[in-house]
């Protein structure tokens, strides 16, 4: 595969970013409790989770040293779960983050997002929010396993879309059930004055592992990419594909930039048990330390080598792939503790003739 000059330059940029590893985005997995029981949950969360919430004081104490290493407001804390709104102290946590020089936002399913909590979060300095809406009513309620979840998410969308100066997007997990209604979902979002829409596929992890209803066939993946490319060309709403995979000829057509898995390079996380990792949905074998025994900044500066030098990913179907120099082993959440083969490859499914080795999934 011959690279374009822009792709070549971007590959150099990606290597340089891995060497610099400046932290810009920090997930706080504040709870594993959730008010839904979604069929595709990568963290296997539930309302009766026995895992304790991570105390905010412990989290704040761990990240305060970042103030000396980074400029004020240069790091965004993305609060996730579980469902962050299960924590009654969420507005207070957000306010203290802002007072200590951190931007913050949250990822929510919208089920508990009421006008009252919306006002409290804005007053606490919330600057960004990601809201899940997984299709039209029937499809969304099926995936979320709750007959009221769509109505609650739409209420949240209306509140969020009406807020001035709030950065937000709506995310949709595309699956075999909702792939045929993307056009209708887009029209729905435009009618509700949504400005940004990000689409994901569902990875074979957590509850989605082994569930064929969650995955897309190659022809459906192509349909998804063509839809996004056309929607971006039309320009009626800002539509992007997620950062989950290298896409070959669809690069820059469905995203603003080339594929770059920034886990452990610019993205870190503190999980509910205090573990220090990258994106919360990657395998726990990638954990680099724990705030209860390690200094977070020291861990960030001196560990994470497995994420910053990914030559170990050149195995399995990646070993002979002619797109490897652009992909660098794909997204880390698609590698398990064995690390002997990527679990799924969208590029291979979109371009089966470009793969020099037969598929072999773990």
Regions found by a protein language model. Name each.
Residues 33, 37, 41-44, 264, ...:
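Cys/His-rich metal-chelating microdomains
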